[in-house]
């Protein structure tokens, strides 16, 4: 099987592809020479993909500027040029199937593949369908999705296949060494513990609310691991310098083994990006979600509301955050074992433990019938 994957810009577009590639190799359905990732030289993919040893090509393309419409003439020019380059990449590589996960770069390569009558698939990992996937839905053969709310936004109902997010299966299959809480941080592995983090770089609003809530959190009969993110760690340590922090609170810059830590957490406080939610639901971790307001179409809030509707999360909008609702939400989960158990079960029901295999099955079906 020869496959071109394309997605760019954010982790939500890249990690599902990386999970699929890993699973395809595990099942010996592809060699490294039979896959190609097409992205941009500016997005996260330009670092993540080559670092993983996956063959990588780039297209020069950019998104529409909603605030300055006149600048979009250049965007259209770039897209037309990118489709010509995409056509050449496809001719040279000769894929059996092309898979896009969103981002403008996937628009060019998947669109061109569909015009060339090569089997095409898009995967939507968020509750709100992105512009590239909305555009491509008319041309592709199949649309894989994670959230039911996303399915409602596609008019091409016959193309829809609910597969879940491939990252779910990857997290479950990782040979994870559980983090030794006692050895690493002097914590009690038998005590309820909450992990609070705002992604690898951190989130200022989350750090600010933890800082304000710290005096109360220090009095609680549970443990707190606060991962500030690399960007904010120095500032946080400076602000707290000279203050004696209670032994039930550990402040760290980042978590280097998330899959080894998550199964031991009673609860997690986090943003609601698609990749994080795939990890939480795969492992059945109760979550308090504080969606980032700085994303297109407010999709993190929609993702979070879907989780809350299913009973798998509590949601606090960033603008509504205060020490009272923040700490009481953590208390609600950590001090009520029945409620935490119900949330965990609801979360697991949302997870798709064989999501990668389901997407691969769609790929194989299209190749077989072409």
UniProtKB/Swiss-Prot annotation:
It is found in: Cell membrane. Pathway: Cell wall biogenesis; peptidoglycan biosynthesis. Its EC number is 2.4.1.227. GO terms for molecular function: undecaprenyldiphospho-muramoylpentapeptide beta-N-acetylglucosaminyltransferase activity. It is an enzyme of class 2 (transferase). One of its GO terms (biological process) is peptidoglycan biosynthetic process. UDP-N-acetyl-alpha-D-glucosamine binds at residues 10-12, 126, 200, 255, 300. It is a peripheral membrane protein. InterPro entries: GlcNAc_MurG, Glyco_trans_28_C, GlycoTrans_28_N. GO terms for cellular component: plasma membrane. The keyword Cell cycle applies. It holds the Pfam family Glyco_transf_28. It catalyses: Mur2Ac(oyl-L-Ala-gamma-D-Glu-L-Lys-D-Ala-D-Ala)-di-trans,octa-cis-undecaprenyl diphosphate + UDP-N-acetyl-alpha-D-glucosamine = beta-D-GlcNAc-(1->4)-Mur2Ac(oyl-L-Ala-gamma-D-Glu-L-Lys-D-Ala-D-Ala)-di-trans,octa-cis-undecaprenyl diphosphate + UDP + H(+). Keywords: Cell cycle, Cell division, Cell membrane, Cell shape, Cell wall biogenesis/degradation, Glycosyltransferase, Membrane, Peptidoglycan synthesis, Transferase. Signal peptide: none annotated. Belongs to the glycosyltransferase 28 family. MurG subfamily. PANTHER family: GLYCOSYLTRANSFERASE, UDP-N-ACETYLGLUCOSAMINE--N-ACETYLMURAMYL-(PENTAPEPTIDE) PYROPHOSPHORYL-UNDECAPRENOL N-ACETYLGLUCOSAMINE TRANSFERASE 1. Cell wall formation. Catalyzes the transfer of a GlcNAc subunit on undecaprenyl-pyrophosphoryl-MurNAc-pentapeptide (lipid intermediate I) to form undecaprenyl-pyrophosphoryl-MurNAc-(pentapeptide)GlcNAc (lipid intermediate II). This is UDP-N-acetylglucosamine--N-acetylmuramyl-(pentapeptide) pyrophosphoryl-undecaprenol N-acetylglucosamine transferase.
């Amino acid at each position: 099987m020869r496959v071109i994957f394309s997605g760019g810009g954010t982790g939500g577009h890249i990690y599902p592809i990386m999970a699929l590639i890993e699973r395809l190799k595990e099942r010996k359905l592809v060699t490294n020479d039979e896959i190609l990732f097409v992205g941009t030289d500016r997005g996260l993919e330009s670092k993540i993909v080559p670092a993983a040893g996956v063959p990588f090509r780039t297209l020069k393309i950019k998104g529409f500027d909603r605030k300055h419409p006149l600048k979009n003439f250049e965007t259209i020019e770039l897209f037309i040029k990118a489709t010509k380059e995409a056509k050449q990449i496809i001719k040279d590589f000769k894929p059996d199937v092309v898979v896009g996960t969103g981002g403008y770069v996937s628009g060019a390569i998947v669109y061109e593949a569909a015009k060339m009558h090569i089997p095409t698939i898009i995967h939507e990992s968020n509750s709100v369908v992105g512009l590239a996937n909305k555009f491509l839905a008319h041309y592709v053969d199949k649309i894989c999705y994670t959230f039911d709310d996303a399915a409602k936004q596609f008019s091409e109902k016959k193309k829809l296949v609910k597969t879940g997010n491939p990252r779910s299966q990857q997290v479950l299959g990782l040979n994870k060494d559980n983090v030794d809480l006692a050895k690493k941080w002097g914590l009690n592995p038998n005590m309820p513990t909450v992990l609070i983090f705002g992604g690898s770089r951190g989130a200022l609003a989350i750090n600010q609310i933890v800082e304000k809530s710290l005096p109360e959190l220090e009095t609680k009969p549970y443990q707190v691991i606060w991962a500030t993110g690399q960007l904010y760690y120095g500032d946080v340590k400076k602000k707290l310098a000279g203050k004696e922090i209670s032994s039930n609170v550990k402040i760290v810059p980042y978590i280097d083994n998330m899959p080894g830590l998550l199964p031991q957490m009673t609860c997690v406080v986090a943003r609601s990006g698609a990749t994080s939610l795939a990890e939480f639901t795969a492992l059945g971790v109760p979550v308090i979600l504080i969606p980032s307001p700085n994303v297109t179409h407010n999709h993190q809030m929609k993702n979070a509301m879907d989780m809350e509707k299913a009973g798998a999360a509590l949601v606090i909008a960033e603008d509504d955050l205060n020490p009272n609702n923040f700490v009481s939400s953590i208390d609600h989960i950590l001090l009520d074992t029945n409620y935490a158990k119900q949330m965990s079960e609801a979360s697991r029901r949302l997870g798709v433990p064989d999501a990668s295999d389901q997407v691969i099955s769609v790929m194989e079906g299209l190749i077989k019938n072409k």
